[in-house]
């Protein structure tokens, strides 16, 4: 397989496609206009960014015979199934793990990235998310656009009035519950205790779908766990699975503990689906999502303010002012006990938070007839102007250093976190497809166990219990990759 892939890549680097074309104009030899289909994510489409991008590109290339159009396909359309029959997109925008899964199976073309305008502006760690090694030679199969990591979203106008006196022990101007998980737990607990509604379901603190291995990654990666180990050449070793490594059991303790302040919607995707509305109406104090969903929170909050009798213009402005996005609290309790008062804890009692992240970007289908035109589009879409516009419209964290610095604030912080290793990049190998179900199953079971306490039927109590749960994840992932594939 490796030899075949190398042969395909060498061929495609020299050129691909079945129809000859004039690379200077983009037109085919017969003089026809080249039309390339672009598959973007749903957020980019709903926000109007894709329309802006395509219109801008087409204006810039109108004299070169290249036209880009919306592929009009579902965000996660299967390139492997549709591509060979000519139904797939020419250019796709997706996360690094998905693109590289396609790349391993030869559905994506490698790109000479050092010839792109964005090359020098993107850090090596982001490029490496699209790196593949075949027969000792390195290829890159995607172009980074933005950095993804789980972020905390909240409404500034929902902060407690006394946070500066009661929730800022060090007086640094940042609430303690945004700096460490013990205080986030304590504040969330206080909100639950103050919920006097008839149903007791109107006031929650921190809320998230705890079964999600990506969004809940801080509960195991912060304690020394990892997804896959690495070989000497830097490539991932899918046989070395590390969910159970080091002190990850303590992180699972914390996950179960926090689940106890939520409701059973944390064991599935219920909270992921309702988080935009629940943040907007004040039911949730804060929640976890990714930077590219910022506009979805804004839309719901704007609507909330409108429903309170404010005009759309004022509501939109108020939403922009009050919706905040910040990185997750940077400190987790070393022993996994969130109930301890942080006032009595020292620096040695905490571990630094690590989250799973990803790099979303563009890739070119192996089945396109117009590789050169696709490269022109990708080069344009990853240029300074369009990445800046994407950042402005979608609230993304750009992979380009110049745009990150220009934007400043949280965007620059996320860029720095990636460079400093605080973000564990999702492995860019096909085997990553097999981690989700085993991890979701166990994380969901552990979260649900928090609701078994009242009936005396808890399954996960001791450190050994949590360790065995994590070992189950490792074992089931291994079986899915190797034993079941035979």
Predicted feature locations:
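Short, well-ordered beta-strand elements
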Residues: 31-43, 66-71, 91, 141
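Extracytoplasmic "Venus flytrap"/periplasmic binding protein-like
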Residues: 56-125, 129, 157, 161-167, ...
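Conserved C-terminal helix/tail region of periplasmic/extracytoplasmic solute-binding proteins
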Residues: 387-388, 401-407, 416-486
């Amino acid at each position: 397989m490796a030899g075949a892939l190398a042969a395909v890549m060498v061929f495609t680097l020299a050129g691909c496609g079945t129809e000859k074309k004039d690379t200077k104009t983009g037109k085919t030899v017969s003089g026809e206009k080249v039309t390339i289909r672009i598959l973007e994510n749903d957020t980019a489409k709903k926000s109007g960014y894709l329309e802006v991008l395509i219109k801008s590109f087409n204006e810039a290339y109108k004299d070169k015979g290249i036209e880009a159009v919306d592929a009009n396909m579902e965000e996660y359309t299967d390139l492997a199934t549709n591509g060979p029959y000519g139904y797939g997109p020419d250019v796709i925008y997706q996360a690094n793990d998905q693109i590289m899964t396609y790349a391993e199976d030869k559905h994506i073309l490698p790109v000479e990235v050092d010839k792109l305008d964005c090359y020098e502006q993107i850090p090596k760690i982001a490029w490496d998310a699209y790196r593949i090694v075949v027969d000792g030679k390195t290829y890159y199969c995607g172009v980074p656009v933005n950095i993804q990591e789980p972020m905390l979203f909240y409404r500034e106008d929902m902060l407690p009035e006394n946070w500066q006196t009661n929730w800022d022990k060090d007086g640094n101007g940042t609430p303690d519950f945004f700096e460490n998980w013990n205080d986030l737990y304590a504040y969330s607990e206080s909100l639950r205790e103050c919920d006097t509604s008839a149903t007791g379901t109107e006031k929650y603190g921190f809320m998230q779908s705890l079964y999600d291995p990506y969004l809940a990654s801080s509960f195991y990666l912060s304690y020394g766990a990892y997804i896959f180990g690495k070989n000497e050449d830097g490539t991932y070793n899918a046989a070395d699975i590390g969910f159970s490594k080091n002190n990850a059991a303590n992180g699972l303790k914390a996950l179960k503990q926090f689940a106890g302040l939520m409701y059973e919607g944390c064991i599935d995707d219920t909270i992921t689906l309702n988080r935009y509305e629940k943040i907007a109406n004040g039911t949730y104090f804060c929640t976890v999502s990714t930077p590219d969903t910022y506009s979805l929170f804004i839309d719901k909050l704007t609507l909330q303010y409108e429903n309170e009798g404010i005009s759309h213009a004022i509501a939109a402005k108020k939403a922009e002012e009050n919706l905040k996005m910040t990185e997750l609290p940077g400190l987790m309790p070393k022993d996994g006990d969130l109930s301890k008062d942080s006032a009595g804890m020292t620096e040695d009692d905490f571990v630094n938070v690590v989250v799973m992240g990803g790099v979303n970007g563009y890739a070119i289908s192996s089945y396109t007839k117009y590789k050169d035109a696709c490269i022109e589009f990708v080069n344009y879409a990853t240029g300074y102007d369009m990445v800046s516009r994407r950042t402005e419209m979608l609230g993304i964290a750009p992979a380009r250093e110049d745009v990150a610095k220009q934007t400043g604030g949280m965007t620059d912080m996320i860029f720095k976190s990636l460079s400093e290793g605080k973000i564990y990049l999702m492995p860019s190998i096909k085997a990553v497809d097999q981690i989700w179900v085993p991890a979701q199953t166990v994380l969901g079971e552990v979260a649900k166990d928090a609701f078994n306490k009242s009936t005396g039927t808890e399954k996960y109590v001791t450190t050994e219990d949590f360790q065995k749960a994590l070992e189950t994840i490792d074992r089931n992932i291994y079986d899915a990759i190797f034993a079941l594939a035979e």
